[in-house]
């Protein structure tokens, strides 16, 4: 039954969840909030939705780029390099991004009498991003259920698994990961050095899956 909305960025995690839950998804939503890599990731969201026959919309959130502070909004030069868990990667946090997106997706779900919103945060996100942690998802779910007539739930099926496990699941689903984007710099190819590139490389290696990504730094 197609009773769900999914937030899909065009990244590895959300594209995997898109395929994983395709039979239940009535609508996929992407957000253009001025992210450095938006021109790279958003077309992949559209591509995979078209491939699966899932309706897809992109909602502009230009106010975030104007008023929020994050290196993810300040151009490629602002993105720090190094492992995802390092202290300097906190600069890539877009404050309460997931809360804002989940609120909008919940309103759309309620408007269409859909019962849940999927988001693809995973276990590796918890270190840096407060709005990816299990306690946040639990609290947000309580708010959306209390604040909607149809009691829309927020579900994050990958919260307790690693990115490597997501890659393994996606490989089993036959996903073409060459058509996903992770790099926060948003250049022509993945830089290979920023936190998301490092994490992506490590995930494929740990999963024992061939990495189809082209990196500028090998």
Label each PLM-derived region with a short phrase.
Residues 148, 205-208:
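Short amphipathic alpha-helical interaction/hinge segments
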Residues 125, 204-205:
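Glycine-rich nucleotide phosphate-binding loop and flanking beta-alpha elements
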Residues 103, 179-202:
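Local cysteine-cluster metal-coordination motifs and their immediate loop/turn environment
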Residues 186-187, 207-218:
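Short cysteine/histidine-rich metal-coordination sites, predominantly Zn2+-binding motifs
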Residues 17-18, 199, 215:
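Residue-level recognition of conserved structural "scaffold" positions that shape functional pockets
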Residues 1-174:
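ATP-dependent adenylation/nucleotidyltransferase module used to activate substrates
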């Amino acid at each position: 039954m197609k009773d769900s909305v999914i937030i899909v960025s065009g990244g590895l995690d959300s594209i995997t969840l898109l395929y994983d839950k395709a039979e239940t998804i009535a609508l996929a939503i992407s957000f253009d909030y001025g992210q450095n890599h938006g021109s790279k990731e958003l077309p992949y969201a559209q591509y995979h939705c078209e491939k699966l026959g899932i309706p897809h919309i992109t909602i502009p959130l230009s106010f975030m780029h104007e008023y929020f502070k994050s290196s993810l909004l300040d151009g490629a030069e602002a993105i720090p390099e190094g492992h995802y868990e390092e202290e300097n990667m906190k600069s890539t946090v877009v404050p309460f991004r997931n809360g804002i997106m989940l609120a909008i997706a919940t309103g759309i779900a309620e408007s269409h009498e859909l019962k849940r919103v999927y988001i693809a945060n995973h276990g590796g996100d918890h270190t840096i991003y407060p709005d990816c942690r299990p306690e946040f998802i639990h609290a947000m779910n309580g708010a959306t259920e209390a604040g909607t007539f149809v009691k829309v739930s927020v579900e994050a099926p990958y919260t307790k698994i690693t990115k490597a496990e997501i890659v393994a699941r996606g490989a089993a689903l036959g996903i073409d990961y060459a058509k996903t984007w992770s790099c926060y710099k948003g250049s022509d190819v993945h830089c290979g050095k920023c936190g998301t590139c490092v994490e992506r490389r490590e995930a494929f290696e740990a999963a024992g899956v061939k990495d189809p990504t082209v990196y500028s730094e090998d």
